[in-house]
UniProtKB/Swiss-Prot annotation:
Keywords from the UniProt entry: Ribonucleoprotein, Ribosomal protein
MF annotations from Gene Ontology: structural constituent of ribosome
Family that this chain belongs to: Belongs to the bacterial ribosomal protein bL33 family.
Name of the protein: Large ribosomal subunit protein bL33B
Alphabetical list of SUPFAM superfamilies matching this protein: Zn-binding ribosomal proteins (SSF57829)
UniProt record, GO biological process: translation
Length: 66
């Protein structure tokens, strides 16, 4: 019998401030992204975490993207 997929899924977190920041504010080009897992049963809404953004060189809000 095949194993079920389970309730944990892999999600990508993207910096919310990198898209609106100008080139002068950024240390390097691009958008900061992290991958993590979340429990589908406990967290139905999109995940939001404060993570370090290497492009802006500070802690920023990272949101789950599709």
């Amino acid at each position: 019998m095949a194993k079920s997929k389970g309730v944990r899924i892999i999600v990508t977190l993207e910096c919310t401030e990198c898209r609106t920041a100008t080139a002068a504010e950024k240390r390097s080009p691009g958008v900061s992204r992290y991958t993590t897992t979340k429990n589908r049963r406990n967290n139905l809404e999109r995940l939001e975490l404060m993570k370090f953004c290497p492009q802006l060189n500070r802690m920023t809000l990272h949101r789950e993207i599709k």
